Amino acid sequence: MARNFRFMMDQKDIVRFLTTTVDSFIQDRLINKEQRTQHKEQCAERLAAEDGSGDKDTEVEYSDQAVLANLDWGIEALEEAINTYNMETKLARLDYAEKMLQVCAMLNPKQKIAGVPNSYLSAWAHLNLSYLWKLRNNVQNCISHALEMFIVDPFFTRIDFAPELWKSLFLPHMSSIVGWYSEERHRLMMEVIPDSADLSFTADFEQFFNESLVLTMRPHQLEKLQKLEQLYGESLDENTKLYAKYYNDCMNSDSSSSKKAVPMLPIAEPPMTPLHELSRTIPDFVKFGPILPKSAGFSLAPRSKDVLNETIRENVTSSNLKEEKLSIWGAKDTIIEENEDDSDSELENESVDSDDKNNIFSPGMKMMKYEGVETKVDLSCQRNQIPSPDIFSPLDSPRTAPNNSSPNPDMHSKRDSKFLRLSSSRIREPTISDSLTSSPDISIDNISNADNEVMVLKNIQRKNDNQTLSMNHENENSLILNGSSLCESDDGYQSFNSLPKLEKLSMGSKPPKDFVCPITGQIFCDPVTLETGQTYERKAIQEWLRTGNTTCPITRQPLSASILPKTNYVLKRLITSWKEQNPELAQEFSNVNTPRGSSCSPSAKDIPMLSTRQRTTDSPNHKNKDYARQRSNRFMPAAITTSPTSVLSQAAVETIVNSLKPYISSLCTSENLPECEEAVLKIARLLKDSKTNPQIHSYLSKPTIINGLVEILSASRNREVLRTSIYILSELIFTDDSVAETLNSVDSDFDCLATLLKNGLAEAALLIYQLRPVFAQLSAHELIPSLVDVIQNKNEELDDFQLVIDPKDAAIAILEQTLMGGDEYSRSLNASSVISANGIPTLVKYLERMEGRRSVVSVLLCCMQAEKSCKNLIANRIELSPVLELFHSGNDSVRGTCVEFLSELVQLNRRTSCNQILHTIKDEGAFSTMHTFLVYLQMAPMEHQLAVASLLLQLDLLAEPRKMSIYREEAVETLIEALWQKDFSNTQMKALDALLFLIGHISSSGKSYTEAWLLKIAGFDQPYNALMKVEQLGQHDNDLIETMEDEKNALNSWQKRIASVLCNHENGSIFKALEECLKSNSLKMAKSCLVLATWLTHMLYTLPDTGVRDVARKSLLEEVINVLQSSKNLEEKILATLALKTFISDPSTHEALRVYAKSIYRTLRRLKKYSVVAVDIMKVILNLKSVDVTELWSCKEVVELDLSSNGEVLSMVYLNGQVLSGHTDGTIKVWDARKRIPRVIQETHEHTKAVTSLCSSGDRLYSGSLDKTIRVWTIKSDGIKCIDVYDIKEAVHELAANDKLACYVSQGTGVKVFNWSEAPKLINFSKYVKSLAVAGDKLYCGCSGYSIQEVDLSTYTSNSFFTGTRKLLGKQTIHSLQIHDDYLFACGSSVDATAGKIFSLSQKMVVGSLSTGLDIHRIAINSDFIFAGTKFGTIEVWLKDKFTRVASIKMAGGHTKITSLVSDVDGMMLFVGSSDGKIQVWALD
């Protein structure tokens, strides 16, 4: 399907495909800064190589220098733009970069500048211009420049600039060319094979690309191959250019218009049509085509006859190409050929392990151009730098004795042919006879005398008789034996004699410096290249390590490998060739004290850097690669040497094998369990005595023996036997991976080991670890409690046997894999299992050991991330020095884990505890922790930068912030830059979380409760109280008050420091970043950003003003108002209100508020019942001179309820979401007023006449009626119930009551007071009372004559509170009294256009008046407004705080008298009763 799209996709599909592919490629490059830097260095290496190959005396012209400088400046400016988050600066740098890069992009590709092809510079410029247009979000131009890059220089674009993109866009079209090349290559190689009828060789198609065949070619054959390679590369380039132009035309052609013809799809034609369809899979490096190494510059033409030798010499020190290929090509990512169903090919591919296939050909081969063509050279030296269990390579193993070094071409040809036949037979045979072990009659001497021919003795493990052997295991255990010492420094390497002789590397009096050991100063005899890239003599570096050193002598980088890698054979061959041409210098600089062959001894090669129990590196689970590498190096085929001190003699091997046979027979055939158990003990003893001899291990690795040992594990109950069986299996697995595969092939084997582990056999953890189970297997058996037990308990030592890995280390490695696998729920569940098994204290204690320390930190980190509550447990027990030591000595990955661990650890619920840990981190260690963190921050990947920045900032703020601190500046800059990463929302979210945790409000469960704390400040304390109740943060039974006071002071001080540093960094740049985050479409991010912004603005006004307040207001005010208007979340609205409250204290904010006053005022009215802050803002808005308060008023009639059948609505009262109305016929109705339209829930008729008055106090309702009774009611959610009836013998016209007494008005003058038990008392002041109001022990009576009497209820005395101006005409009366917030509102007849007055009860004076020409009969007051009802059916509305009239409501019934008036508590609804028996409901929006 990879190529079918050529015929299926129309132009729109192609444009969509290009957009997706190129955009993804460019996006990946922009994300990966390290890759861009490495790519620039590699291109610079090619430029430097070209410069070095030219004439040293040639002077580069100034114009050429300027062009190269423009390219460099353009790339630099582009990189600065990528790293800049200020948009103005970014755009300016992008403009500058475009100008610089366009200079090189427009160069004539057919010319050169300073020896560099213009096409190379132009393609490089187009690549960077593609980056540039992607940053400008112009996809069209981005794709155009990317395609232009392939048009200008398809070759170098394919190998240097964009190999991944070439693979996606062009490779699917090249299948016919690749097929042609493969067929031609096949034809040439068949001429090389001595016996072309050897079908076993042709069975493996990849062998035709093996350079061992190239090295055996004759000159005329090599010339043909070179021309083929050249023609193949040219075909790929031409067709790449052809398709790039086609893609470009598709992008520029408008499919919806007929103005431009639709481009025609090109066809990639090979130079010659293949005769047959290709049915084989092709290695990736073949599809990729010829490659020119960076160090070769741009020299596609031949330089000398010995270019191949130069190329080989280059490979000793260069590993860039392999790294590139590994990152681009998969192990078997092939073109889908015409015949996709070829079963032979599939079986053959499946029989070879993918990792080993990758190691043989794909990453390890180059195609080097020389004399106009290419040949491939193996990068075996690179494998030595990164050891791995590679498949046997013909370039590494065949060796000849010194007496066979004669440069006789016939002999060489013969030897190569024999070797090829032997190799083909190894590949052909599915099973190999184990004659070595069953009949140990072959000796080293016999092999030496067999015509000095190279023989391959197989030591291959079977799984079962019907199973096909895996090729990687077969090759991994091959032993190559020859007839003499294997010291490579003796006499050359035979296979290289087919190549031209090496030219002299040095014309001086000294050998090349690459041939000399920097420690001994002598020419290498046995060179080993360490992981740092430095090469040393094996004995010298072993002595260096034996003295206790753990770092590279030159680079001082720590060495993680536990044993030395293999010999650098490529360098060794170069040295041998140089010695032949410079015998005198070789003799002078050779180490005469080093015996010949001594460095080849396995006792020298395989000495581990750690003890036997420390064979693994920092952790036994070091990604399993170190373990495999260690096993591969320890059991290398070094037993072929004849040195008597290196391995057991052959006679000893035969003796041990003969001794093993009866016990093996018992183990595999006997049904007597004790006999089998005894056999196991004997086998273990003999295995130990063999001193890890590979032949003995091979003999014991048969599937039948493995199955016998597993049966013992299943059947035996003897712990010693079980542990010994595990020891044997562990040793065998350590030697041979096929043993592990044999065990893994049967699920019950793993189940058996899991059962043993659960039953308390600690050693079972070691075997489980060596089997490398997947997460699903571990999870299914629930091994965590058992693993914790292994770590906790002291393991029993095997008497005479030493395990390859400590079971505790293995258990920790398995525990780490279990905790890091699965989804978030699984990780949380597994972490809880570790905590519940009491594993935390043991793991913390285990940190004291160096082995497994990284895994322990990783496990503890997983526990803290999954279960935040365990942080305190870890913090109280941990010693931080081991973690800091691990950070200082570890690689980037380990450092990242340590930083994440420390960052999580300081997120405790007490600030004092956090500060103590921070002090420990700061003061521990021999190095400056803060400086180390700073250095790591500057090179750490993005996922770790936030953690180290947070940690570094907290360490810096332990002391009072100084005026300037590089640590603080770098940390804050990192956090703020992360907030600008709008294309990476995860990074923004992590930055917000880090900043919220920096504030310090953290619960005992490890969560930030800054939001709840801010809501509490705003008056909405329900979330905070609920959190405190659940978390019990406010309850510290064992803490002293002084301690909690210290904690409070520490937290307040910390908040001020954090707020000061964040707000004042670069003049409030964080507020600009938060402004962008608040615009995010992610609700979670916007919420976190709002919390942080609210906290910062709240703290900002507690700090001295440094000019940042204005920046914060300009950045956040509009966003906060937008949240207030548009958000549907109550908490968000309250947070926005709190932030707005801090801004309104600044007078400059008032003008901005005027624009939004009307829209936010309504929202604030709804919020005032939840937040007192809303009330404060409303007051500010109402007091703004520029705001017309009448514009803020809005109301709407909701419903009119017709109750005329019950007569007039004489009284109403609002209580707990219910409205109660009293009617003329004695009915009391209870309404559910929680919704906009009230609903009757109860109707009572216990009064026989009109209910004239209703009032409430507490949970009691009091009703007065003309039937001469006062009734007391209980109020419930479903209605009212009468509990007392008082017959007072006279009609009640007005009533005010509470639980102590009742005051009522009857027909006479004065007022009567009834204490519920005695007879009513009359307080007569010779005036008719029209209204009553009670406040404490004072009763206020609105009387005729426009006066107010005050009655002292404790003494039953009265006095005049207010006497109004009387008029000669008409009666003036106080019709209604209301007490609200210590103010007495008195309304009645209009006198001098004033119908109401407001009195301060504390000052007993008039503080305001209500101006209207109408008499007011009823009054209602809520928190915002005063409502006054008149007898003509209108309601006048005033602002309660300013006594300013804002509106007038006209009743629908015309001039109907308003008889009752009431508003709800929230001030959102108004209920009006009238004389026509109707109730109108108004919504006050």
Curated annotation (Swiss-Prot):
Acidic residues bias (residue ranges): 337-353
Highest taxon, organism lineage: Eukaryota
Stored Gene3D superfamilies: Leucine-rich Repeat Variant (1.25.10.10), YVTN repeat-like/Quinoprotein amine dehydrogenase (2.130.10.10), Zinc/RING finger domain, C3HC4 (zinc finger) (3.30.40.10)
Tissue expr: Expressed in roots and nodules, and at very low levels in calli and seedling shoots.
Keyword match Repeat: yes
An example Gene Ontology molecular-function term: ubiquitin-protein transferase activity
Record has Repeat as a keyword: yes
InterPro entries (UniProt xref): ARM-like, ARM-type_fold, ARM_LIN, ARM_LIN_2nd, E3_ubiquitin-ligase_LIN, LIN_N, RING-Ubox_PUB, Ubox_domain
WD repeat intervals: 1204-1241, 1246-1283, 1409-1448, 1454-1485
UniProt cross-references to PROSITE patterns, sorted A to Z: U_BOX, WD_REPEATS_1, WD_REPEATS_2, WD_REPEATS_REGION
Top EC category: transferase
Pathway: Protein modification; protein ubiquitination
Catalyzed reactions: S-ubiquitinyl-[E2 ubiquitin-conjugating enzyme]-L-cysteine + [acceptor protein]-L-lysine = [E2 ubiquitin-conjugating enzyme]-L-cysteine + N(6)-ubiquitinyl-[acceptor protein]-L-lysine
Biological processes, Gene Ontology terms: nodulation; protein ubiquitination
UniProt-listed SMART domains: Ubox, WD40
EC number: 2.3.2.27
Function of the molecule: Putative E3 ubiquitin-protein ligase involved in the rhizobial infection process. Plays an important role in the early steps of infection thread formation and in growth and differentiation of nodules.
Protein name in the entry: Putative E3 ubiquitin-protein ligase LIN-1
Organism: Lotus japonicus (Lotus corniculatus var. japonicus)
